[in-house]
Amino acid sequence: LSAEIMERLKPHLQLAETVGLLVSQLAGGHVKEMELRLQGEFASHPSQPLVIAALKGLLSAGLGDSINFVNASLEAKARGIQVLEVKDESSRDFAGGSLQITTRGDQGSRSVTGAVFADGDLRITSIDAFPVNVTPSSHMLFTRHRDMPGIIGHLGSLLGEHNVNIASMQVGRKIVRGDAVMVLSIDDPIPADLLQTITAIEGIQ
C-alpha cells in the first residue's frame, strides 16, 4: 500500500490494535479463533493491514514487544489461531463505520467494538454487546457484574482505600437489574492482590 493510504489508515490501524489487545485480555486462556468484522466505512478500507494490526494487539498481551506487523500473522498461524474476516458495508452504526473483534477459545467468546470519530479519537463502543463510550487509556479495569445497588460504590471505596485514582467510569447495561459491564480508566496499574479482592465482590462475575 502507498504511504498516503497507510497514513489515512493510521487511526484505524491504531483502533484495530487497541481492540485486539483489549479483547485478548478479556478472553483469557487460549484463543482459537479471531473474527474481524468491518462495518460501514471500515469495510471500504483495505482489510489486510487491519487484520495484521488486530493480530498484533491480540498477541501482544502475552508476547509483548516481540510481536510486530511483520511477524503477527506468522505467530498467529503458529499458535493455531484461525482468522475470519467479515465485511458489512451496509452497517450505519457510526458515521465512519466500526470495527469489531470477536475471540473464541477455551473460556468462551468475547467481543469488543470500536470506532474512529471525526476528530480522530478512538472509542470503544461496546463490550460483549453492552453499549459503552470509552476512550482507551493505558490503565483500565473491566468488570462484568449484576446491575444491583451497592456494587459500584463498593468497588469505588475499595479502590480509594488502596489509593487507586479513577479518571473516568462508564457503565453499560441492556436491561434494568440484569447484567452490566463497567469500564474504569485509572491512573496506575492495579496490584494482583487487589484484583483478587475485586473479583471476590458479590455480584461481580
Regions found by a protein language model. Name each.
Residues S2-Q205:
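A conserved regulatory-domain signal marking ACT and ACT-like small-molecule sensing domains
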